[in-house]
Amino acid sequence: MKKFALLFIALVTAVVISACGNQSTSSKGSDTKKEQITVKHQLDKNGTKVPKNPKKVVVFDFGSLDTLDKLGLDDIVAGLPKQVLPKYLSKFKDDKYADVGSLKEPDFDKVAELDPDLIIISARQSESYKEFSKIAPTIYLGVDTAKYMESFKSDAETIGKIFDKEDKVKDELANIDHSIADVKKTAEKLNKNGLVIMANDGKISAFGPKSRYGLIHDVFGVAPADQNIKASTHGQSVSYEYISKTNPDYLFVIDRGTAIGETSSTKQVVENDYVKNVNAVKNGHVIYLDSATWYLSGGGLESMTQMIKEVKDGLEK
């Protein structure tokens, strides 16, 4: 009888321990299972599964970086390429943010070492998408220049959904829409045309509607001095004589050399016998845009705000 009682107690104890163990395992599994959303983007039309509110993010797109910063999410940034950071993002030079290579040459080993929950890339890293995806869920958030505002807003809203910041994004986009309406009114009132050029080591590229910098025409309402510029990412190669012949009322200048830390060539482009007599130069309407923001960044909540202001201030000079 005594042996039977001891055996019964042992069996009951084993059942209780087993039940507690299963409950503990179940609770742990529940805690570690994260909510996910599916993000459709240019490099994965079926969608990439992304964890909600990721704690560590590696960002290769400066526009997305400034959106995260604008939304108060700078603390989740684990790493970024620091080589040519635009001035307005200089806070991210701090050592608490890891340097993960350059925009064109990522340090995949460093990215993997950080063990991120999410990686955000854009056009300059698109060819490395598969390599990034082996490390962590990777999404492409670059703007489509042919549909600039649509893609810009979509990118911001995507970040809002991932981080539960949808209301904040909505407010920021409303402010941007208001600022765009203001710059368009200014452009319409002036009724002048403009030409966007990029100087690169003495060479010149022009950008028209639907091109990389076409938002100056398509979104901000500045009439193009030349309607026939071929839309492309790198612009249409042009000469000093072309600028003279086109004779724009406003000349918007981006200096690639300055943006990437090399020698500026804007004076060579603007201050020469061919260009000095165009309307824009004679009337003091040459607008030198912040090259790092326009060439390296753009498409973020903060960069878009700055770009609108630059164009509006330039038109009101």
From Swiss-Prot:
Broad class of where this protein is predominantly found: membrane
Q: Which PROSITE patterns match?
A: FE_B12_PBP, PROKAR_LIPOPROTEIN
Residue limits of the Fe/B12 periplasmic-binding domain? 56-317
The record's listing under Gene3D superfamilies reads: Nitrogenase molybdenum iron protein domain (3.40.50.1980)
Where in the cell is the protein located? Cell membrane; Membrane raft
Keyword S-adenosyl-L-methionine in annotation: no
Which chain positions have N-palmitoyl cysteine-type lipid attachment? 20
Q: Has keyword Cell membrane?
A: yes
According to the record, the signal peptide region is 1-19
GO biological process per UniProt: iron coordination entity transport
Source organism superkingdom? Bacteria
Q: Summarize what gene deletion causes.
A: Disruption mutants are unable to use petrobactin for iron delivery and growth.
Record's bilayer topology term: Lipid-anchor
Q: Provide the family line.
A: Belongs to the bacterial solute-binding protein 8 family.
Task: Note the subunit structure.
Answer: The complex is composed of two ATP-binding proteins (YclP), two transmembrane proteins (YclN and YclO) and a solute-binding protein (YclQ). Interacts with FloT.
Task: Supply the name of the protein.
Answer: Petrobactin-binding protein YclQ
State the species of origin. Answer: Bacillus subtilis (strain 168)
